[in-house]
Amino acid sequence: MGKQPLAKKAEIVDKVRSLLQASQMVLVIDYKGLTVAEMDQLRAELRKSDSVCMVVKNTLMRRAIADQKAWAGIIPFLAGPTAFILIRGDISAALKAYQDFAKQTKKTEFRGAGIEGLSLTLEQAKAIAELPPKEVLMAQVAGSLKSVATGLAVGLNAVPTQVARGIHEIPASLGRAIRAIADKEAA
């Protein structure tokens, strides 16, 4: 394979950068042994989850992520024949599509993943994929905060009620005590 002109390499790096900026996670896989038809099949499956599979030279990927701390986690995996799955949409759907493809072909190997500057193993990537979407997590937090606020309001409302009951009880108790003393003296 001949050397690519510098302008072509810069164009590839720019394209990869723009795809990375739109991505939530990057999976790094070894594609050695996959046919063109199999790569096309993987790409088609990944498109369903708004993900892209691309083969980029490791040196060009290093250039693309050089100034992006969010993708520093994939640097240890940049060796040998490497394909990158850039996940822009549903992480769990993309991961499942890749795993199903890997089981079917038995020709690809998961090297690792990167997210927010971290390197992830397959198990860690699966754990992240199983998290509910951001909107659901935010709703759960909001619901928890609402229940805490409601409990606090009910508790604070109960304090004056208890004080009022106590104040009301003092004269009644005093009246019962005076009546008991009077009954004792009368007897």
Swiss-Prot record:
Gene label: rplJ
Keywords on record: Ribonucleoprotein, Ribosomal protein, RNA-binding, rRNA-binding
Family per similarity comment: Belongs to the universal ribosomal protein uL10 family.
Gene Ontology, cellular component aspect: large ribosomal subunit
Subunit structure: Part of the ribosomal stalk of the 50S ribosomal subunit. The N-terminus interacts with L11 and the large rRNA to form the base of the stalk. The C-terminus forms an elongated spine to which L12 dimers bind in a sequential fashion forming a multimeric L10(L12)X complex.
HAMAP family according to UniProt: Ribosomal_uL10
Function as written in the Swiss-Prot or TrEMBL entry: Forms part of the ribosomal stalk, playing a central role in the interaction of the ribosome with GTP-bound translation factors.
Protein name, per record: Large ribosomal subunit protein uL10
GO terms classed as biological process: translation
InterPro entries in UniProt: Ribosomal_uL10, Ribosomal_uL10-like_sf, Ribosomal_uL10_bac, Ribosomal_uL10_bac_type, Ribosomal_uL10_CS_bac
Matches recorded under SUPFAM superfamilies: Ribosomal protein L10-like
A GO molecular function held by the record: large ribosomal subunit rRNA binding
Source taxon at top rank: Bacteria
